[in-house]
């Protein structure tokens, strides 16, 4: 299998009191091409920190993040930003859509920032919204959408630039069980259809069991679950 994302001996320490607070300690992980992996761990275990490091939003205290075999350890902030824009998509528990723009515009904007022409960005955005069955709400602002619709638009935005990796932090955690299952099915179907590799943090073990692998955080290490 081809490794897309590798976390190598990752350490993350925070200063606190007389000794540092250790969140991650020589943590290792490989996400292979086309894999859908669940990150299952209790609140406060370090899931968000792990995702932020994997997504180059946060620098580890030590260790390296490898994306498609290339080290990111010594990349400048501008280089890390460019990698995020082109290769990494994010979905959060709360959608973070721009409230003043429509659903369609929210999916177009990151593409235009990346250099796509407006007409191409619009065409790509509509295709994604159609695939996620929310194109009929394309001209509505986020406040006019249901929670499930908001998350589907957020998913479309996350994959709009054609990333190789999708990272999701509790993407269904704020939804009711029925909507949660529907949004997860839409997300997993899109990941598989687009050939993405995804690491998804969730408290929902029933959803986690539907993924290829499951990992957790134990004693500041990444551990495989059955």
From Swiss-Prot:
What Gene3D superfamilies does this protein map onto?
A: P-loop containing nucleotide triphosphate hydrolases (3.40.50.300)
Which cellular component terms (GO) are annotated to the entry? plasma membrane
S-S bridge residues:
none
Q: Give the top-level enzyme category.
A: translocase
Please provide the Gene Ontology terms (biological process) for this protein: lipoprotein localization to outer membrane; protein localization to outer membrane
What family does the database annotate?
Belongs to the ABC transporter superfamily. Lipoprotein translocase (TC 3.A.1.125) family.
Could you identify this protein by its name? Lipoprotein-releasing system ATP-binding protein LolD
